[in-house]
């Protein structure tokens, strides 16, 4: 889910979303993204990433006090026999999360019971270092697949996209990019995360480098997706887990 802010300007409604979904991607192979989770409140509302058997990383803008975490999902409309549904025990937003500019848009969810890891449910490692521009990453989610209009898929969608340079990112969003954000995708448009993908993973070289956070529309030219820079939060993640 990308964060959606509606700006009404001269009678035109412009979507500035922080709710991400995949546009221009492809259906992931079944259970090929075993760390991907669906956050559910009677409906899918955000994605997340399993980082160990009892903790999930998502976006702070996805916060709800009670969340059911659905693991091992591929088709979220069917029970395929690989799923585990586990309620949250704790939901912890970053203490410096800013809902206005989406700085520090990261959140931890402690599961009420430990997930049983399997071929279909696996954790993803935290980054050992920040990823450089040009690194190709896998972005995934059940978010909207249309840049204009809505189509929410049942099957998990994947997108391969490169990390953009800091200058490309800041030029696309002047004054809006903090040190805790990076851009990934294609300045030409056509491929992006979108509403419903928010909180989900950006995995580069097998490590969780990003969390789907926000963007101006989806897959629009010169407006790439913006992601939380997980490498800046490894210490916070580790200390929060150890103290909870």
From Swiss-Prot:
Active site: 61 (charge relay system), 105 (charge relay system), 198 (charge relay system)
Disulfide bridge map: 28-158, 46-62, 130-231, 137-204, 169-183, 194-218
InterPro entries cross-referenced by the UniProt entry: Peptidase_S1_PA, Peptidase_S1_PA_chymotrypsin, Peptidase_S1A, Serine_Proteases_S1, Trypsin_dom, TRYPSIN_HIS, TRYPSIN_SER
Coiled-coil annotated spans: none
Binding site for Ca(2+): 73, 75, 83
Signal peptide location: 1-15
Transport listed as a keyword: no
Pfam families named in the record: Trypsin
One cellular component term from this protein's GO annotations in UniProt: extracellular space
Catalyzed reactions: Preferential cleavage: Arg-|-Xaa, Lys-|-Xaa
Keywords tagged on the record: Calcium, Digestion, Disulfide bond, Hydrolase, Metal-binding, Protease, Secreted, Serine protease, Signal, Zymogen
Site (Required for specificity): 192
Enzyme category, top tier: hydrolase
EC number(s) per entry: 3.4.21.4
Gene Ontology biological process terms in this record: digestion; proteolysis
Subcellular location: Secreted, Extracellular space
MF terms in GO: metal ion binding; serine-type endopeptidase activity
Family: Belongs to the peptidase S1 family.
Protein name as annotated: Trypsin
